[in-house]
A protein has these predicted regions:
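Short beta->alpha connector loops
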Residues: 115-119, 141-143, 183-184
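Small/aliphatic-rich secondary-structure junction motif
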Residues: 4-80, 156-159, 168, 172-238, ...
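Acidic/glycine-enriched edge-of-secondary-structure segments
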Residues: 109-111, 145, 149-152, 174-180
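A short acidic, glycine-rich active-site loop
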Residues: 77-93
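Gly/Ser-rich helix-loop-strand patches that form or flank binding pockets
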Residues: 2-12, 39, 44, 48, ...
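Amphipathic coiled-coil/heptad-repeat helices and related helical stalk/stem segments
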Residues: 35-38, 121, 146, 186-189, ...
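Structural beta-alpha unit
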Residues: 2-18, 60-61, 96-135, 229-261, ...
Length: 295
């Protein structure tokens, strides 16, 4: 793995201290490229919370494994060279876009390029994310690789991640909805979301009934604890009615006026394929609003 570091801060020099959050933004370059939307959303999000954004462009190295038949039919070395050049060019474009947006928004930005082999691309994203407080990700339905990267980071980094939908998000994140079922993963998500919960103007603790048995007062108890911490929190119970628990949670959160959803991520790796819980799968299949997910 090769690393190229480049620091590109905005015009504002911020004195770094222990309270400055560090956000990680992986930028894919091959076979698909990260979108410009995730860069603009990441810059806006980091700016809102006064965080230092670290963009990491992942370029690929494709090993050439000689094969007699393929050598006769294809110019494999030339194809590899083209793919690697495309990856490098996309990395330069993404880094330039991040630099310009961060400078305009006066957000502190560090950029680096990490070169890795194509099969290890997703694992590399997860490994890089371990150094930071939070990962910022995108999931686009017709770009499967974005979901693969998201799954790798969520379940392999040990860090919380925020998944953004593929649309421009404008405005402050003032109303947080916590999807609460009393589970370990949900508790972990609430703890990881504390910086956002404490800054929010309002927090709604949402429990959906009808999908699995839930303690009747669990959500209300969490809301009480949050209130005792000085947070404007309340509990809400809704009925699960749609075919997808993940979509039902998101739709209910939007109906409540949520700017961001907080939830636990359920899943485990089986032979390098992730077996996901229903809510997690539904959110990654079609994120409808920013979702902080923690595993």
């Amino acid at each position: 793995m090769e690393i190229d570091d480049c620091n590109r801060g905005g015009p504002r020099e911020m004195e770094q201290d222990m309270t400055t959050a560090q956000y990680f933004l992986p930028l894919a370059t091959y076979p698909d490229s990260s979108s410009g939307l995730i860069i603009s959303n990441a810059v806006a999000f980091a700016g809102h919370y006064g965080a230092h954004l670290h963009a990491c462009a992942l370029t690929v190295a494709i090993p050439h494994i000689p094969n007699a038949w393929s050598s006769l039919l294809l110019d494999t070395p030339k194809m590899i060279e083209h793919a690697e050049t495309l990856s490098r060019d996309r990395a330069a474009t993404l880094v330039s876009a991040a630099t310009n947006l961060a400078a305009s928004a006066e957000v502190e930005l560090s950029c680096r390029t990490v070169k890795t082999t194509l099969p290890l691309l997703h694992d590399t994203a997860a490994t890089e994310a371990r150094f930071f407080d939070l990962a910022i990700l995108e999931c686009i339905a017709d770009v499967p690789d974005t979901r693969i990267v998201a799954e790798a980071v969520i379940f392999g980094s040990g860090r919380p991640a925020i998944i953004f939908p593929n649309k421009t998000l404008v405005g402050l994140i003032d109303h947080l909805v916590v999807a609460w079922d009393g589970s370990r993963a949900a508790a972990r998500a609430v703890n990881d979301a504390k910086p956002f919960i404490h800054k929010a103007k309002r927090v709604s603790v949402l429990s959906l009934t009808g999908e699995k048995p839930l303690p009747e007062t669990s959500g209300a108890h969490l809301a009480e604890i949050l209130v005792s911490s000085g947070i404007n929190a309340s509990a809400t119970v809704a009925r699960f009615t749609s075919s997808s628990i993940g979509q039902s949670i998101q739709q209910t959160a939007l109906e409540l006026g949520a700017d961001m959803l907080v939830m636990g991520g359920f899943g485990h790796s089986r032979l390098r394929d992730f077996v996901l819980g229903g809510a997690t799968d539904g959110v990654l299949e079609n994120p409808m609003l920013p979702v902080l997910m923690s595993h």
